[in-house]
Amino acid sequence: MADRLAALLAHFSVSARTFHAGALCGINALDATEPFGQLHLVRDGRVEVRHGVRKALEIDEPSLLLYPRPMAHRFITDKRHGATFVCAHVQFEGGPANPIGAALPPFVCLPLARLPACQPILELLFLEAESENCGRQAMLDRLFELVLIQILRVLMEQGQVEAGMLAGLADERLRRALVAVHEAPERDWSLEALAEQAGMSRTSFATAFRDRVGLTPGSYLQRWRIGLAQKHLRQGRSLKLIATEVGYGSEAALSRAFRAQTGSSPREWRNSDAVDA
């Protein structure tokens, strides 16, 4: 079976930065003003999680809470005993244009028992969090990144995401077409060629793809290519070279597709992205 995450992670990395390890007692509020998400590991204790006016979530077993994008939340724990957390900021390269971050739901909660393959990583992470070893920060950050990858695996394998790219990658047939696009965006992909990758008829493939991924195959292909083009523009590469690498026959063709997808020309987008940075 093709590696569903290899091309995604090769093009769009995820990173973590640990910012807390220890007890949280009483009420702790985290706002949505920072430009990154958060991953919290609840090692022990009871926690009430609140998201605005939504019904509170009660956690009474070791669990993880992933917020791939900024989202205000509050933790309410016992004032005396609290709960033990290890927390990290998470960042998806490219921000909103990162297809991995964009494909995740706003909030994921999983009991740690649902990640059996991740137990050795979690044990090492908790051990490192308690230590004062040299390189502790770097070690914790890398371990959190491994946990993130394991979360993606679990969401696909257990069908936790109902729509979007990850839902498509969870489908035995659609995943073959998606991986082919991710690995070779420069190919001249037609609907027939993608349907052949999936082993389906054109009509069945187009319908299934739209129902699961939420986009037509052509729209998804354009979004993936333009996402790659944006990454290459940040790296300062020439538009001519980018056009060839992401599957457009000329700079003009790429510019038309880029404007259709983003509302800006590649030059305008690069200038505005540089200002924002």
Identify the residue ranges that each predicted region occupies.
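N-terminal regulatory/effector-sensing and dimerization cores
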Residues: A16-P106
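Short, Lys/Arg-enriched, Trp-marked, Pro/Gly-tolerant hinge/linker segments that flank
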Residues: F107-P116, A129-F144, L148-R187, L191-A198, ...
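A short, N-terminal "cap"/entry segment at the start of jelly-roll beta-barrel domains
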Residues: M1-S15, G26-L30, P106-A113, S131
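Aromatic/histidine-rich interaction motifs
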Residues: P99-E123
